[in-house]
Amino acid sequence: MAVLPMKKIEICAMKRDRKAILEKLQSLGMVEIQTDNEETDDFRKMSTTSQRAKYEKRVQNTDEALQIIDKYAPEEKSIFASLEGRQEASEADIQEIIAGRWDYNREVKKIQEISKDIAGCEAGIIKCQVAIDGLAPWLNMDIPINTTGTEKTDVMIGTMPPGLTETDIQGYISSAEPEIAGYTVTVVGSDKDQTCMVAIAIKTVSQRVEEILRSHGFTRISYFSKRTPEQKTDKYRADIREFEQWIEDKKNELVSMADDRDKLRLLADYYRIRADKYKVLGSILQSKSTFVISGYVLERDVDRVVAVLNEKFSLMADVYDVPEDEAAPIQLQNPKMFASAEGVLESFGLPGKGEMDPTTPMAIFYISLFGLMLSDAAYGLIIFLACFILIRKFPRMENGLQKSLRLFMYCGISTLIWGILFGGFFGDLITVVSRTFFHHEVTFKPVWFAPLDDPMKLLLFSLLFGLIHLFGGLALKGYMCLKKGDAKSFICDVLSWFMLITGLVLMLMPTELFASIAQMQFNFPGWLKNTSYGLAIVGAAIIVLMSGRDHKNPVLRLALGLYDIYNLTGWLSDLLSYSRLLALGLATGVIAQVINQMGSMAGDGIFGAIVFVIVFIVGHLFNLAINMLGAYVHTCRLQYVEFFGKFYEGGGNPFRPFRENTKYVDIVSGTETQK
C-alpha cells in the first residue's frame, strides 16, 4: 500500500559517450528519461530522425517477413500459448543476431520478394480465370478469334443483346433488306449478358450487313488471338497450372525459411531497441562536447544506477528530490495478494500528486464484494482451481495477465466462502440430485442463512456492507487530510459526515419503517437516542457552517453549506447502489436452481441421467460465465463510482523507465553494443 519514493536525476557526460551511456541505461531499465527539455543557446537537441526512421523501417520489414512466414508456415501452438510468455534471449543470442544481421536482412528482403511474387501469381491466376469465364460462351466457335475474313468474304465476330437466336438475327437483316443475299449467321453461345455470334458475308454486302446488325446492338469482339477459343482456354488453364506449381514451390521455400523464425523475431526486437535509443537520443540536450540527461529514478535504485554509470564512464550524476511543482511518475508497491488488484486501480487512474495508494483497501473490498455477488461455493472452487492451476503451470506469463488471474483466484476463494455461508453449491444441486436419483433428500445447509429464503435480510446486509464500504472511502480521505497536517479539513469534510450519517442511521434503526424492512425491532435507551440526535445535529451544523470556509462572505458561506448538506441525496443514492449485491447474489442462485430443475425433468433413469449431465454442464457454464462477468463489472463500478468518489481522484502518470521494450522476446540480461 505504497507509492514508491522517486528521485530526480541529472547526468552530465562527454558527448562521445552519449550512445554508450544510453545503451547502459536502456539495459538497466531503471531511469525514466524526460523528453520535453527546453533548448538553450548552448544546449540543443540533435535530430536523429533519419537514424530512427531507418531502424523503424527495418522493424516494419522484419515484422512483415514474420507475418508472411506465419501465413504460409503457421507455428503449431497450444490453446494456452498466450499464457506461456515470451521466449527468453541471452546476451549471447543478441550478439549472434548483431553479427549476422546483414544476412538476416537479406533473408527478410527475400521473404518479402517471394511474397510479392506469390501475390503476382495469384493475381495472374485470377486474370486467367476471368479470361476463361469470358471465353466460355465462345467455345463452340472453331475459327481463330482474330479471323477477319478471306479474299472474298468478311467475318464479323461479336456480340448482340442476350436471348437472340439465329432466326431472330436473320430476321433483322431480311426485314431491313429483303433482297440481300450472300451471308450467314451462326450463334455460337450465349449467357445472361450477351449473345455470341459469327456473321460471314461476301464483301459486296458485308458492310450493309454489319450496319443492320449494329442498329440492333451488334458489337465486334475486342479480344484478338490467333487461337480458337478452345485453344486459348487450354492455354489459360496451362498457365494456371504453371502459376500454381510456381506458388507451391515458393511456399515450400518459405516453409524452409521458417526455421529462422526465432532469429527474425530477435532481429526485429533488436531493431526495435535501436529505434527507441535514437528516439531518446534526439530528445536530450547536447552541446559541442557534452550532453545532459534528466529523468526520474526510484529511490531504491539510485545507488545501483549511479554505481554502474560511474564504474564504466566519466560523468557527473546529480540526484535530488523531485521539485514541489513537478508531478513525479508513479510506481506502486504492494504485497502480492493486493498487488493483483493494481490493474483495477490503473484502469481508473494512478494516484495523483499527494494522494495515497488505495490498492490494499480497494483489493479487500473488491474481493469481498465479488464473492458476495457470485456467492456459490462450487463456482468459487472452479474459479480458484482454474486460476491456481494456470498460474502454477505457466509461471512466465505476462505480468498483467498473471495479476488478473491471481485476483480472480482470490475472488474464487471469496466466492467459495460466501457460498458456504449462504448454502449454495451449484444452486441446490445436492438437494435435486439426491431427491431425483436417490429418492432421499439431502440438503447443503447454509452456515449463515439462505438468501432465497430471506431476501430482505440479504438486502439489509448488502446496504450495511455498502455503508462500511463508503465509510472506508471517507476514512481514507481523513487519513490523507491528517497525513498532510490539515486537521481543519479532517473535522469539517470528514468527521462531520461521519457524525451526520451515523446519527441519521441510529435515528432510523428504532423506527417502524426499519423494522418492517429488517424484520427486527431495535429499542434504544434514551441516552443513545439523544446521542444520535446530537451527532446528526452537530455534524450538519459543521457542514453548513464550514463547507464554504474559504469564502469570507458569510451569506455565501452559509449558502455553500446548505448546498453541501444536499449531498445527503448523493449518499442515499450511493448506498442504494449496493442493492445490486442482492440482485446479483439472488440471480446466481435462482438461475442455478432453474438449471437443476430443468435437468431433473427427464426422471431418474439412464436417459434422465444423461439429460441431467448435459443440461448441468451447459447450463452451469453459462450461469458461471454470465454472472462472473456481471460480478466483475458491478464490483468495478462500486469501486470507481462509490468508493473512489469519497476520496480519490487519480490522474498520476505511470513510471515508464527507458528500457529494452520488445515484442517477441524477453532479454534476460543487458547488452552493450556499439554502432
Q: Where would I find each of the regions flagged by the language model?
A:
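Long, charged N-terminal accessory/stalk domains
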Residues: 1-362, 390, 401-405
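Conserved, carboxylate-rich catalytic/transport cores that coordinate ions
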Residues: 2-7, 16-22, 26-33, 303-675
